[in-house]
């Protein structure tokens, strides 16, 4: 058995001994499941727990070492001496270290927090923090966020005393240890933001911090000490300043409720303005007063008819078209002689240089709809596409099939002339297309009438025509024949 497994077994038996009700008797009652070495460690763990409890009450570390040695000797266990058990009580000989090793720290998390036995394992704190940790009413006192965890460090006695007093008001009934190496999350009701520090406490912490900064130490312990003290200082000062400066005066705008425009009597407006005497005006009256220098009139004045407008209205009242004699039009125009004419007659004369005939006169005025209707949009959308099949081939080329003439009787003579379109590629291609027309379809089992219908195409395929003739027309004609007659 190597040393690691032995140490883990010893740690398990040492922490489980309070629940089993003793060391030697419980080990003996197990039968053959527990070795004598574990039995001895069980009794040693029980004595260790008693000596550990005496430590929290004020006993010295030397007494605990003697107690452990006697317990190991009385247990009769072989294989471990006093030096091997240094992992359990070496932490108590040095008051500056307050953390467990990770393997033993996991075992402490298994202990129930509400255990009422006096042998419960308590956290390792040194003497200045013991007055508020050894309370008679709580079997397991919680640790504060500033003095527990792997990153905790030794601090000045007066600083720890002040921190202990601050932690007394935020204690909880039970707080279990975390099985992680980083510091545990503080309780909800004892977060650093909720801690209120007085002037004297703040001054004591500040003096300790300045003393540590003056030493100039660059070790990791001093650096972590600064981390421990700084949050309490910053949060305390922030809470003190926020407590004195958070006096929110959320009073509604009661003065605006009783305002009324002195000109129009309006009680609600986007923006209240003032006139020259300081009275309130609504936005409209205020703008009018600013632009015109006088109060805004409450009644909109009627449009004043000038002499010129009266004369023009009188002239237009008896105006009639010199051509069609109509009196209603959307626009009055003048002819070449200067006589007034309606819009229709004036446009007609402008376009044709002839007076508009009276037969075209209409009683109603026809207005032009400038919005495109859905039908006109559809018609415009069809334009610009490919020509229909009638653009390539005459509709007379397609006739009903005549069963008496075979399959090829449905084509006219002009249909066969389209075979020359395939010869616009190359002489070799023309020969290939000619063989397709004359012999290709015959090989597929077509009748003699089909071959006779394409005989002209076969004879024309040998001639070479210029390459300027479109090739896609021949392909499209054959594509339409295949889709329509297969």
Swiss-Prot record:
Offer an example of a GO molecular function term for this protein.
Answer: zinc ion binding
Q: Which keywords fit this entry according to its UniProt record?
A: DNA-binding, Metal-binding, Nucleus, Repeat, Transcription, Transcription regulation, Zinc, Zinc-finger
Principal cellular location given in the protein's record: nucleus
- Give residue spans, biased composition: Polar residues: 166-176
A GO BP annotation: motor neuron axon guidance
Compositionally biased tracts (Gly residues)? 20-34
Q: Where are the zinc fingers (GATA-type)?
A: 261-285, 321-345
Q: Does the keyword Transcription apply?
A: yes
Location comes to: Nucleus
- InterPro entries named in the record: Transcription_factor_GATA, Znf_GATA, Znf_NHR/GATA
Signal sequence, renumbered to the chain:
none
Compositional bias annotation for Low complexity: 40-65, 236-251
Spell out the GO cellular component terms annotated for this protein, sorted alphabetically and separated by semicolons: nucleus
Cited PANTHER family: BOX A-BINDING FACTOR-RELATED, TRANSCRIPTION FACTOR GATA FAMILY MEMBER
The molecule here is called GATA-binding factor C
